[in-house]
Amino acid sequence: SGALESQPLYINDNTDPNSNSPIEIESFSSFSSSFNTIEFGPEVSLTIPSLLFINTNKYENISNTRTVFSASLNYQRRLNKAKLDFERGIQELTYGYAWSVKNKYIHQLDPISFSAVEVNKSAEFDDRINSLNDKLLAASFQNHIISATRYRFIYSDPASSNNGRTSFYYDANVESAGNILNTFYKITDRPRDATSGAYKIVGIQFAQYIKTQHDLRMYNKINDKSSFAFRFVGGLGIPMENLSDALPFEKSFFAGGTDKTRAWKARSLGPGSFRDSSVVFDKIGEVLLEGNMEYRFDLLGFLDGALFVDAGNIWLANEDSLRPGSDFKVNRFAGEIAIGAGFGIRVDLEFFIFRLDVAYPLKNPSLVVGERWFFQPKDEYNTYLNTLEFPLNVPGLYTPQINFGIGYPF
């Protein structure tokens, strides 16, 4: 798989920290936007139709048993004005099991998943990160190793099994990385790195975290020509001792993009109500909440239409003095939910669906309370823009986003 996307950087001299898997081609606000990021990820796997080393004879209800050995490579390269910002390469080896129960429940267990992540940064990009004095951002762009165990549960209830109109889908996963390694290193009294205070494998720090994500969907068929689709996604990741500043970049949550909160570019929303006054990098978080609703209907022949509303955001799990408003608070998070709406055209060619969605931001949580909705005055925000040396470089608050994709967003 692969993708091209536009991730422009907007830089201003005001550095006051107290200022408030469908295949996709990333959203962009105009056809003149340049693609500056390339990403591809080949994968090979060997599937054996049984659970190796496990006796399944006493389990009557399981079927479709599989043992999977896989190897994958993910490469990402981003440019800034034709110059390299960074390259990231991820090599992963996985050994896992999968099986079904009663043709409704799918279980996937990966006892061993080993990844090596190498980041090559330009000197200019590294200087920009260091100048921000942001430990979370710096931790996201460092070399590391991930030794993880994963479990995934999928429940699928087709419409034919209940009233013929409503179907449900639930996808939950949990992942633990580095915890066994960290415990082993402690028990065996291994030395820590003198500079970082962390344990390392062959000179590379290993990540330590726990992470879970839950995806619940409901599809309601109104008639043969129209239906509703709903989705709710929640996720939480907690970085732990050996890499405690942040989750690894590739394991972090993000908002925006072609199948999330479509009125924002991928990784341009959040975290929380934090307003980035110095530079727009990839915005990532450790807490994710998202809800989507679509009304899908036939138009003409192979053309279908959709009206949709997206809501969501990301947050940090802990308070960050450099990012006020970025942490998740029970008494504050509801007001920090971004909301967008739009319409889409889908070309249904049976073997795949080509999708074009146009989304408009209705509520922007990076603004102060009283200015977040599109119809509210923007006095404080306009004052803020006047403090910047290059205010025209800041993207517009309510610019429609055009998204292209293959397949439904959910």
Please provide the spans of the model-predicted regions.
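Short Gly/Pro-enriched loop/turn and capping motifs at secondary-structure junctions
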Residues: R78, L300, G312-L316, E350-F352, ...
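Metal-dependent nuclease catalytic cores in nucleic-acid-processing enzymes
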Residues: L51, I345-F354, P409
